[in-house]
């Protein structure tokens, strides 16, 4: 395949950075453009100091700026779109999430058409499939079962509608000829080094005598390591550029999991952190049906107060369902069409993540030592 170029949106994020790292090893790749609204100084420096012959262009811009997006897409072969606002707690305003996740994706698709970018890979989420009820049990589900979220909460709704827009855009005519080919990847809950969710869990536990918060004791999930999700994006980029593989991938979506054991979110947090003296919360937990009812009451109060006060419930029905369900999916379709096999084993992923958690513990100790001086 001839030399090519790739634009990665959300490149300063947890997943985006890992995708860029793997792209550096791709043959015939001539340029990577990394786009985000804001890069931390250390991330920006990391991109500038990469030991590579590949041209790396750092772009800071808003995904809602259509003119900027069009310039960013000029001369690009593949767009990998990971930029998103992730919030299942209701803290971030609904319109902000819809603007970035849905409108931003629509803007980027239009920019690709105007700049004649032939391939578009969308980082979707398992949230677009559900779970819709904590009573529903999905074990090793697959794409043919056509699960679809019915939640109106902004994150699952915006990702679902954005994915629909991406897949509907497959086959669109490009401005100077040719066709846009798209696909979407639906990773499970992503863990690994620099996970913002795990980081928050650990930092909170460090302030609570190393007791891990209870976030999903009654769930059964199949978490996926960030390096394996990034690898799936690389394979999708290869596949859409390969004339033999591309027809099977165009307009398709894929669940991305790996060989991480099925477990609850609480068990995952404990397994990854127990080496550093963390322990699970042994206190009694409310059953899921009661939590769901309480969430409904809190949401009702929030709605009634909304004309005069913005009350954000500590949890909502979507979050209770998400963290109280059995909801797992197979990666067989990605294996068949993309040639996907997990790049990193569970044991290696566990070790890498645990070692990183150790650095968080050390940083916390150093902070306490500094304050005590």
Curated annotation (Swiss-Prot):
It is a single-pass membrane protein. Its main location: endoplasmic reticulum. Expressed in skin and testis. The active site is at residue 155. The keyword Transmembrane helix applies. GO terms for cellular component: endoplasmic reticulum membrane; mitochondrial membrane. The chain crosses the membrane at residues 288-308. Pathway: Lipid metabolism; steroid biosynthesis. GO terms for molecular function: 3-beta-hydroxy-Delta5-steroid dehydrogenase (NAD+) activity; steroid Delta-isomerase activity. It is found in: Endoplasmic reticulum membrane; Mitochondrion membrane. 3-beta-HSD is a bifunctional enzyme, that catalyzes the oxidative conversion of Delta(5)-ene-3-beta-hydroxy steroid, and the oxidative conversion of ketosteroids. The 3-beta-HSD enzymatic system plays a crucial role in the biosynthesis of all classes of hormonal steroids. May be involved in local production of progesterone. This is 3 beta-hydroxysteroid dehydrogenase/Delta 5-->4-isomerase type 6. It comes from Mus musculus (Mouse).
């Amino acid at each position: 395949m001839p030399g090519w170029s790739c634009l990665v949106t959300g490149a300063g994020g947890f997943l985006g950075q890992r995708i860029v790292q793997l792209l550096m090893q791709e043959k015939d790749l001539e340029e990577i453009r990394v786009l985000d609204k804001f890069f931390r100084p250390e991330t920006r420096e990391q991109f500038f100091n990469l030991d590579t012959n590949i041209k790396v262009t750092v772009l800071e811009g808003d995904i809602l700026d259509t003119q900027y997006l069009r310039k960013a897409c000029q001369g690009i072969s593949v767009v990998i779109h990971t930029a998103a606002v992730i919030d299942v707690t209701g803290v971030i305003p609904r319109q902000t999430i819809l603007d970035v996740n849905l409108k931003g994706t629509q803007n980027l698709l239009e920019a690709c058409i105007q700049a004649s970018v032939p391939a578009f890979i969308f980082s979707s989420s398992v949230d677009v499939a559900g779970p819709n009820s904590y009573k529903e049990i999905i074990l090793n589900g697959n794409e043919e079962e056509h699960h679809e979220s019915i939640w109106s909460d902004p994150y699952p709704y915006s990702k679902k509608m954005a994915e629909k827009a991406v897949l509907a855009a497959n086959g669109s005519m490009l401005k100077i000829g040719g066709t846009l080919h798209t696909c979407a990847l639906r990773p499970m809950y992503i863990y690994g080094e620099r996970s913002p969710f795990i980081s928050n869990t650990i930092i909170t536990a460090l302030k609570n005598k190393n007791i891990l918060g209870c976030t999903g004791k009654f769930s059964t999930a199949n978490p996926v390591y960030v390096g394996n999700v990034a690898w799936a994006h690389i394979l999708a980029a290869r596949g859409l550029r390969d004339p033999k593989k591309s027809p099977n991938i165009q307009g398709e979506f894929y669940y991305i999991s790996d060989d991480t054991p099925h477990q609850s979110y609480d068990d995952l947090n404990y397994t990854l952190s127990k080496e550093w003296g963390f322990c699970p919360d042994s206190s009694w937990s409310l059953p899921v049906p009661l939590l769901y009812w309480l969430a409904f009451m809190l949401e009702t109060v929030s709605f009634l107060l909304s004309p005069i006060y913005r009350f954000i419930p500590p949890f909502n029905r979507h979050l209770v369902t998400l963290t109280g369900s059995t909801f797992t999916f197979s990666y067989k379709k990605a294996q068949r069409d993309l040639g996907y096999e997990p790049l990193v084993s569970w044991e290696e992923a566990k070790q890498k993540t645990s070692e990183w958690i150790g650095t968080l513990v050390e940083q916390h100790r150093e902070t306490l030592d500094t304050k005590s001086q």
